[in-house]
Amino acid sequence: MFVYYCKECFIMNKQQSKVRYSIRKVSIGILSISIGMFLALGMSNKAYADEIDKSKDFTRGYEQNVFAKSELNANKNTTKDKIKNEGAVKTSDTSLKLDNKSAISNGNEINQDIKISNTPKNSSQGNNLVINNNEPTKEIKIANLEAQNSNQKKTNKVTNNYFGYYSFREAPKTQIYTVKKGDTLSAIALKYKTTVSNIQNTNNIANPNLIFIGQKLKVPMTPLVEPKPKTVSSNNKSNSNSSTLNYLKTLENRGWDFDGSYGWQCFDLVNVYWNHLYGHGLKGYGAKDIPYANNFNSEAKIYHNTPTFKAEPGDLVVFSGRFGGGYGHTAIVLNGDYDGKLMKFQSLDQNWNNGGWRKAEVAHKVVHNYENDMIFIRPFKKA
């Protein structure tokens, strides 16, 4: 009995052991399946996430390329500027500010190449956006043009063919008069061919009857007046012209430097002639200033050119600022009707061909057309 019981117990234990082993296998299998499913699900999620990220990157790249293409097309149609866009860059992380005064990107001035570094903030694909300063954008061109316009307004330079660029000074319109004993405003106004009220307004004088000795007054430069010349008979006039022409022949084919500056200028020749007549040269920053910077009341008569005007031998001719790089030109008339139609005259010129400053152009004869803005100065004296 005992043996049988033990065998039966042994058989039962063995069967129970098999059942437990089967349960354990099933449990392990279920656990393995669960882990496998979990891992598979995780990998699927990761793959799905990666796919979404790539889709987003692709969308950004596509949008960026479309944006770049549209901007390039717009630039071709308007300013023909070129912008190099290498790669797909997040436009929201790129700060490019352009205005009429400056063009700065991330603290760098636009006159250098602007390069946005390869960082996560600036690039999603590890590429760079490069803007070359040799290919300016529309805003930069506008800023440059405005700056040039501003500089041109501030700068007033006239090209001088002889000495390069000089700042040109206009002839003064007023001069200073010092009040002397016995002066009155009416006498001063009469002397300078103006009115009492004009002097009052220019100098802020409240009482025209009250001025002081030594007081400085601004008065006009002597205007172009035409005093009555002395009548000369035809015989005397012919003799005077002959004597003038004979003197001018002595100036021809020689270089003249009256003031010792800038070589043989046109002004020098005229000053040599005027000094021969009156013992002094003429004032003026440039040749075109001669009629306005000198008092010719007792020395000459001023003429403006008209269709019927005929210059005489010995007259000074003054060209406007359209000649001589803004300084004008001056010469001495030899023949006032060179072509017989009052269209041309012949004169003795120096530096007409810009060779005087090198002392390479002596005084010589030149035929000119009458210009409507010419002024002629006829001295009362004859050489």
Swiss-Prot record:
PROSITE patterns from the UniProt entry: CHAP, LYSM
E.C. number(s) listed in UniProt: 3.-.-.-
A biological-process GO annotation: cell wall organization
Residue ranges of every copy of the Peptidase C51 domain listed in the record: 241-378
SMART domains assigned to the protein according to its UniProt record, in alphabetical order: LysM
GO molecular function: hydrolase activity; lytic endotransglycosylase activity
SUPFAM superfamilies in alphabetical order: Cysteine proteinases, LysM domain
Domain LysM, first and last residues per copy: 175-219
Signal peptide location: 1-49
Secreted is among the record's keywords: yes
The keyword Aminoacyl-tRNA synthetase is assigned to this record: no
Protein name, entry field: Probable cell wall hydrolase LytN
